[in-house]
Amino acid sequence: MIDPNRSYEQESVERALTCANCGQKLHVLEVHVCEYCCAELMSDSNSSMHEEEDDG
């Protein structure tokens, strides 16, 4: 007899090993998203701005 919990466990593991953004298989050290999606999602749109100077 097939264990229904085993099927759910297999699906859960498969989801955990897949990028939540693009669906690519994750490497061992990656969690939730692959390195490419992480770089895209975490890129700072203000990275070209300079640090503000104190007036006082």
Swiss-Prot record:
Family: Belongs to the ninF family.
Protein name: Protein ninF
Organism: Enterobacteria phage P21 (Bacteriophage 21)
Lineage: Viruses, Duplodnaviria, Heunggongvirae, Uroviricota, Caudoviricetes
Gene coding for it: ninF
